[in-house]
Structures are given as structure tokens and as C-alpha cells.
């Protein structure tokens, strides 16, 4: 018998990462979290629990603005938790929102709510002493935060298209079904946060807590899923591990099935050429009745073949690289018990939200409110958080958080439209903004993210102000360029699908990437490395001047810089993302 490893499993020759031990020894994700909750000597979690709380939807953070000051005073960092709610499709009820708002005001260090591009909300700054209260509140509201972080299938995205209301409802139901189907089966979340019950690993019922899909070591790495309805790519489909592109049956008007695309992901590590961003690849088409079986088969293939030795190469895109796309498809088909059909034709033309009012085919109105970087907080001149609360008090429909960090006041009856608009205008939820700002995005970064290398959310408004001036200077202010800033290369701001992407390198310095496109189907290439925001604006001034005068009719900025040779396209990131021969040494 040959000892040769099955293709894709060569990583098994190396020691497993310590995270694999942690998961296996975690008592089905319980760890000793309850003991840490009783420890008042520290505001954080110790040992394995620091990682385990991520499976419950939380990250331990601290205020980096005052970290050095507290260190000088011999104090531990001001520790607190980020919580990310599980909210497949981003739909939330006004009565739920009122309670979510109250908790943020009463218990959140920053007194804000952050809408994320994973189509949910986050709390930043929740002290350890309030964590059980927070989870019990979510439970009372019919919500939870299980599996919104760490090595699981995270919050499932779904197109927020309010116009085709019946089709959207179908897509939303599938997003919920996929989310529920891929959840962990353990009761650990409920035991720790709701009942506060300590369960020992020897307890007999633990043997029944089987994880038939995720396994007892769960997935090798984070896993992101989206459901999308063309032609609007409002979930940034190509950035996700697993994607379901809804195909409409033209006879019935209902969903016939899904094109399945896999292996997207935008994170990489500065200087590590074994890491790279990539767009999702076409796997095949499945009829709607086989959706869950396809999802499960893809996930279990990643579970069994994904790299558990090197977490930097553990995402699905690396598994596909190791197995080859054809090899991966064959393994998924074997588990699924059927072959994929040929991809059905589809096209994406844009991906931003439709800011303002739109009317659905069901005659209901939907108001999309622009929320810069998703931050709902009350500022003296812009009390957005209170505005949302006031809307929640009177709105009879629902809210939909979008994957572009905005929020839709959905299902407004004709007779209620004026009241909703008046409140939204009063609190700045309707205001004049440029198309450039509408299509900009940032991650949180400083002061709460421990991975941040440079500012992101806090510099985006001023950066867009300056870029708007450049656009006006060159008479292209009616157009827009998809612009995104992320504070480190982990990719939370999705800069690796932008026409202009800034990736934090050090405090005040960024790598500038150019050449993505409006539809979000292309990775931008590194153009300038380790430069300041002022230097970036200077570079963009010259490039936008050329775009304004030399572009073809309707040509986007990202397409233009490729066509005229300012930047070379990223054709296959596995091969050419890091190719130094393709990176400009001087501006063209």
C-alpha cells in the first residue's frame, strides 16, 4: 500500500496548530469560561478561553488609545468585548432594535452600535461583567451570537434587494436555512451564557453532542457564506468562501436553483507570498432542493481537507489550490451524491446600495439610509443612533442591515411614508452625500481592533472629503470610484475588491492598490507601498485627472487604469498577486 498522501492532505505531515488542541479539549466550546466570568481581578479571559469566546461571537479587545497610559500607571489595558450578533440576511424587527439600543446606551463603553459588512450589528466595549446580561437579552429577543466568529460558518449574507420582494423573501429563507443547518450542535453556548450551568466533560449527555457537519474540531478556519440575486452584487459575492447565486425560473418567477461559487477571501499577510486574496470560483449549478446538501458537502470537504497545521493557509481558497478546483468539485460531488450542472448565465452590473426610497413590486416602500462606516452613534450635528431609535418606535415593518454597512427601513406603507421620511431627515438619516461617499467603506481599526496597523474608520470621512475635492476639480463629481480603507491586510474593509484600496501598513502609512472594478469581480494590484494619506491623494489627483480626460464612454476608474497600462491586472492571484515584475516602480 502506498504511503503517498491524498492530494490536498500533504499538510498532515506537519504538527497541528495549537488551535486544534484547544478546540478538541474545549468540552464542546465550554472551556472554563464560567470560571473566568467569576474572576474580578481581570477584565479579560485567560488561556484557552481568550480564543474560545470567539466561537460564541465575541473578541476580547482593549482601548488602544489609552493602552500606553495605563501601562505607565501599572494598570492592565482597559479590556472589554466585541459582540457580533448572528443575523442571517440582516433582518431585524423594530421592537428588537429598541432593546438593542438600550443595552448599547446603558452598558457599552462607546455607546454606539456598529453595522458591519457581514450584515449584522456589533457592540464594542462591553465589560466582562455585562456579558451574561447581554447574551440573555439576545436570547429573550430570539437572537444569539453563536458562530459569528472563529472557525465556523459565520453570519450568512443575503441580497437586500427590496424591489423584487417575493424573490428576496425566498433568498432570505434560504440564507436562514443554510445558517441553521451549519450551526454547531453543542449546547455549550446556552450552558455558559443563558443557564450559567457548569457541565463537566464526563457528563453522560456530552457524548450525545455529536457534530455531524462541523466535527469535534470544527472547521480549520473562518468560513463565510452569501446568497445573492443578480444583477446587484450587494454582498460582495466574490469575497466569500461559499456563495449561492439565485437563478430565477422565468416561467414561475420563483427561484429555480443556485449557481455555486467557492473559494473567495481577501485576507493576506504583508510580505508572506504564501498568502493572497482571491475571488470565488465557479463550481456548478444545483436545483433549489439540493441547496442544503450542496452546502453541507462543501463544508465537510473543507472540514476534512482544510489545512489544520498552518492557519495562514487554512481558508477554503488554499484547500482548493491544494486539491485543484476539479479535484475539489469531484470530492464535493461524491459527498453530495450527484453531479453539479453547468453554471447558468448570470451577470453583476453594480454592488452599491440604492440610497433613498425605492418601491417594491408589492407596493411597499423601502428607505435605504446611508450610515458612514456603519457607525450609529450620536454626534452633536448628526444624532444617527437616536434617529434609528425614534424610527423603531413608530415603524410597522422591519429593518434590513446591508452588507455595505447601511440600513433599510423596509416595508413602509404608503400612508406611513411621510412620517418615516420626516424622522429620518430630522436626525440626518436622509442627507445630501456624494456618490463617492456612498460607495466608500472602512473597517473599524483603531482604537478597538488589536490587529490594526493604521487608522481606517476614523480617517475615512476626511479622506473622502479630500477625494471629493479632487473629483470636483476634474469635473467628475457626478461619478464615483469604489474606495475602501482597511487598517491591516486581514481584509475586513474589503479593500481587495475596490477600485482604490488602501491597506494599513504602519501608523499613518498604507499600501495603495488599484484596478478593481465597480461590479466587484477583480482583485486590485499594489501600486505604491508604505505611503501617507497625503501622498496617496497626490497620486490619485494625477490619475483621476487622466481618467477624466482620457476615459472611454462610461469607463470606470479601475477599468481605465488597466486599459492604459497604469497598472497590470491580477489575473491569477495564486501566481501573480506578489509578482514584483508587475508592480509599478514609478507612476506612469
UniProtKB/Swiss-Prot annotation:
It catalyses: hydrogen sulfide + 3 NADP(+) + 3 H2O = sulfite + 3 NADPH + 4 H(+). Pathway: Sulfur metabolism; hydrogen sulfide biosynthesis; hydrogen sulfide from sulfite (NADPH route): step 1/1. [4Fe-4S] cluster binds at residues 443, 449, 488, 492. One of its GO terms (cellular component) is sulfite reductase complex (NADPH). Pfam families: NIR_SIR, NIR_SIR_ferr. It comes from the Bacteria. GO terms for molecular function: 4 iron, 4 sulfur cluster binding; heme binding; metal ion binding; NADP binding; sulfite reductase (ferredoxin) activity; sulfite reductase (NADPH) activity. One of its GO terms (biological process) is cysteine biosynthetic process. Gene3D superfamilies: Sulfite Reductase Hemoprotein, domain 1. Binds 1 siroheme per subunit. Residues 1-10 have a biased composition (Basic and acidic residues). Keywords: 4Fe-4S, Amino-acid biosynthesis, Cysteine biosynthesis, Heme, Iron, Iron-sulfur, Metal-binding, NADP, Oxidoreductase. Its EC number is 1.8.1.2. Residues 1-20 are annotated as: Disordered. Its cofactor is siroheme; [4Fe-4S] cluster. PANTHER family: SULFITE REDUCTASE [NADPH] SUBUNIT BETA (PTHR11493:SF47), SULFITE REDUCTASE [NADPH] SUBUNIT BETA-RELATED (PTHR11493). Belongs to the nitrite and sulfite reductase 4Fe-4S domain family. Alpha(8)-beta(8). The alpha component is a flavoprotein, the beta component is a hemoprotein. This is Sulfite reductase [NADPH] hemoprotein beta-component. It comes from Mannheimia succiniciproducens (strain KCTC 0769BP / MBEL55E). The gene is cysI.
Amino acid at each position: 500500500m502506498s504511503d503517498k498522501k491524498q492530494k490536498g492532505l500533504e499538510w498532515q505531515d506537519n504538527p497541528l496548530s495549537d488551535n486544534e488542541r484547544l478546540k478538541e479539549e474545549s468540552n464542546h466550546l465550554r472551556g472554563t469560561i464560567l470560571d473566568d466570568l467569576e474572576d474580578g481581578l481581570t477584565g479579560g479571559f485567560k488561556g484557552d478561553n481568550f480564543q474560545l469566546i470567539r466561537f460564541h461571537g465575541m473578541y476580547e479587545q482593549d482601548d488602544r488609545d489609552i493602552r500606553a497610559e495605563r501601562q505607565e500607571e501599572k494598570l492592565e489595558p482597559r479590556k472589554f468585548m466585541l459582540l457580533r450578533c448572528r443575523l442571517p440576511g440582516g433582518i431585524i424587527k423594530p421592537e428588537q432594535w429598541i432593546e438593542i439600543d438600550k443595552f448599547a446606551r446603558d452598558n457599552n463603553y462607546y455607546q454606539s452600535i456598529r453595522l458591519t459588512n457581514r450584515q449584522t450589528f456589533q457592540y464594542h466595549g462591553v465589560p466582562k461583567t455585562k456579558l451574561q446580561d447581554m447574551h440573555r437579552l439576545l436570547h429573550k429577543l430570539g437572537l444569539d451570537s453563536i458562530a459569528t466568529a472563529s472557525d465556523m460558518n459565520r453570519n450568512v449574507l443575503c441580497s437586500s434587494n427590496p424591489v423584487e420582494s417575493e424573490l428576496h423573501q425566498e433568498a432570505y429563507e434560504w440564507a436562514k436555512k443554510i445558517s441553521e443547518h451549519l450551526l454547531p450542535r453543542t449546547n455549550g453556548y446556552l450552558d455558559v451564557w443563558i443557564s450559567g450551568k457548569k457541565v463537566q466533560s464526563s457528563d453522560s449527555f456530552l457524548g450525545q453532542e455529536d457534530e455531524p457537519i462541523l466535527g469535534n474540531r470544527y472547521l480549520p478556519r473562518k468560513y463565510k457564506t452569501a446568497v445573492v440575486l443578480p444583477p446587484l452584487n450587494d454582498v460582495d459575492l466574490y469575497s466569500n468562501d461559499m456563495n449561492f447565486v439565485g437563478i430565477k425560473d422565468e416561467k414561475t418567477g420563483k427561484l429555480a436553483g443556485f449557481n455555486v461559487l467557492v473559494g473567495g477571501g481577501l485576507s493576506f499577510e504583508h510580505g508572506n507570498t504564501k498568502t493572497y486574496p482571491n475571488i470565488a470560483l465557479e463550481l456548478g449549478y444545483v436545483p433549489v432542493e439540493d441547496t442544503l446538501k450542496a452546502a453541507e458537502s462543501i463544508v465537510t470537504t473543507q472540514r476534512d481537507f482544510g489545512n489544520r497545521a498552518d492557519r495562514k493557509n487554512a481558508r477554503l481558497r488554499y484547500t482548493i489550490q491544494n486539491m485543484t478546483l476539479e479535484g475539489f468539485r469531484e470530492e464535493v460531488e461524491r459527498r453530495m451524491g450527484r453531479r453539479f450542472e453547468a453554471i447558468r448565465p448570470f451577470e453583476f452590473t453594480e454592488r452599491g446600495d440604492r440610497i433613498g426610497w425605492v418601491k417594491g413590486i408589492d407596493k411597499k416602500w423601502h428607505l435605504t439610509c446611508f450610515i458612514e462606516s456603519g457607525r450609529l452613534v450620536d454626534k452633536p450635528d448628526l444624532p444617527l443612533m437616536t434617529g434609528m431609535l425614534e424610527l423603531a418606535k413608530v415603524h410597522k415593518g422591519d429593518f434590513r442591515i446591508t452588507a455595505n454597512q447601511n440600513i433599510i427601513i423596509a416595508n413602509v406603507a404608503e400612508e406611513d411614508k411621510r412620517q418615516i421620511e420626516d424622522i429620518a431627515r430630522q436626525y440626518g438619516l436622509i442627507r445630501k452625500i456624494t456618490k463617492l461617499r456612498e460607495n466608500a467603506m472602512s473597517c473599524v481599526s483603531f482604537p478597538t481592533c488589536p490587529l490594526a496597523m493604521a487608522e481606517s474608520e476614523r480617517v475615512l470621512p476626511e479622506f473622502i472629503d479630500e477625494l471629493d475635492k479632487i473629483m470636483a476639480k476634474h469635473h467628475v463629481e457626478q461619478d464615483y470610484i469604489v474606495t475602501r480603507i482597511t487598517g491591516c491586510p486581514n481584509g475586513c474593509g474589503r479593500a481587495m475588491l475596490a477600485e482604490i484600496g488602501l491597506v494599513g501598513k504602519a501608523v499613518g502609512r498604507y499600501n495603495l492598490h488599484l484596478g478593481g472594478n465597480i461590479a466587484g469581480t477583480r482583485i486590485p494590484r499594489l501600486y505604491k507601498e508604505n505611503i501617507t494619506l497625503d501622498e496617496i491623494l497626490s497620486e490619485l489627483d494625477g490619475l483621476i485627472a487622466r481618467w477624466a480626460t482620457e476615459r472611454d464612454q462610461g469607463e470606470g476608474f479601475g477599468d481605465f487604469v488597466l486599459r492604459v497600462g497604469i497598472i497590470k491586472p491580477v489575473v491569477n492571484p495564486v501566481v501573480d498577486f506578489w509578482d514584483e515584475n508587475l508592480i509599478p516602480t514609478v507612476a506612469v
